[in-house]
Amino acid sequence: MLLIKRARIVEAASEKIPALRESIGKYKEKNHILVYCGATTVRDYGYQEGVPTSEEIRQIDAVTDLLGNQMGFRVAQFTSKEDALTRSKLIKSFDQGEMIQALIAIRCLDEGVNIPSIDKAFILASSTNPKEYIQRRGRVLRLYPGKNYAQIYDFITLPIPLDKVKGYATEDISGFKGLAKRELIRMMDFAKIAQNPYEIDTLIRDIKNAYDIEDEELERESEEEWDD
């Protein structure tokens, strides 16, 4: 069961790349874009600050190829490989928006990097830890001249597509509900402060119905996440 669950999650996560293509296309002429990659979080076993995993490297390279080569964005990677001077130059160029439209990064929102000019963020590195994703969100929402709001696309991972959930036995679905609940909690938290919560309300309702998740379950799960 654990192997199946892992395979489902990996497969679902890989679908974030085509979803990114669909979402980011309308910003082809815009600047100050961050694409935040990553397969692990600071709570994961084996996490080392400044040392990306092979999965993270594969994702950031895939995103770089998509945006830079296939879609024609002016991009740069922002990872632990760059020294402090290089990072400073990248941020300056990103702020100016002439040479770099988009930074494709690993972990920078978790490791103290401050780039307040970001006003469009595509977060592929989902976290179910509220303290972690609130910190990431807060870094994107930093004040900057001419920046009145930020647009955040937070990509969720569901182990089973909504249109296929009903084809699974109840006992199989129960093994996947934990992830679905944690993703729902993050979605609901984002919706609370969004200017367009109505765009996510329907999806939240559909996920609840498909996975048979009650509001009381989400409340308990949320309290447990904050207590960890």
Predicted feature residues:
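Conserved helicase ATPase core of P-loop NTP-dependent helicases/translocases
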Residues: L34, E55-E111
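Conserved nucleotide-binding/hydrolysis micro-motifs of P-loop NTPases
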Residues: T40-V42, D83, L109-D110, S126-N129, ...
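Short, flexible/disordered intra-domain loops and linkers
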Residues: T41-R58, L162-A180
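A short beta-strand element within the Helicase C-terminal
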Residues: Q101-I106, D110-S127, E132-R139, Y149-F155
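Long, largely alpha-helical accessory region at the distal end of helicase-like NTP-driven motors
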Residues: K164-D228
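Amphipathic alpha-helical transducer elements in NTP-driven molecular machines
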Residues: S14-I17, A102, P130-I134, G146-Y149, ...
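Conserved segment of the helicase C-terminal RecA-like domain
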Residues: R139-G175
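Interdomain linker/hinge connecting the two RecA-like lobes of the SF2 helicase core
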Residues: M1-F73
